[in-house]
Amino acid sequence: ASSIRDRIDKLEKEARAAKRLFEENDDEAYKTAVSSLYSRLRATWERALEDIVFANVVMRHRDYIDTKNLKRVTALEEADVQIFQNGFKKCCDFVDAHDPSRGHDPEPPEPSEVMADIKSLKDWSEKLRSKMNGVS
């Protein structure tokens, strides 16, 4: 599995490729690319929750709980939770995994917004990792 940083790097590259489609007015290809990107962004938010917030204490598909990093979880604050929820929810709005409700089939965000959403995850994960590393 890729690290959070590697995943974010790939997402940034995908966003730059999608931006070219946007600039070429290839609306259908851009919409497809952005939907795919937000699906991976959503998965990266999930992985960051597991790896950073829960400090690998609890991991999917592992049959034990590793309590040695449990204290690090205390660095999580309400603002961190809000940023996570906002970023994750936005991803859910743009992925094909969910059938859009009638009247709610949003246009994909413009490239600058896509990059801002990736940056939100990047900033959140780096800030939280730093806070958690400060827990002794």
Q: What spans do the regions from the language model cover?
A:
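Long, charged low-complexity segments
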Residues: 1-25, 32, 36-136
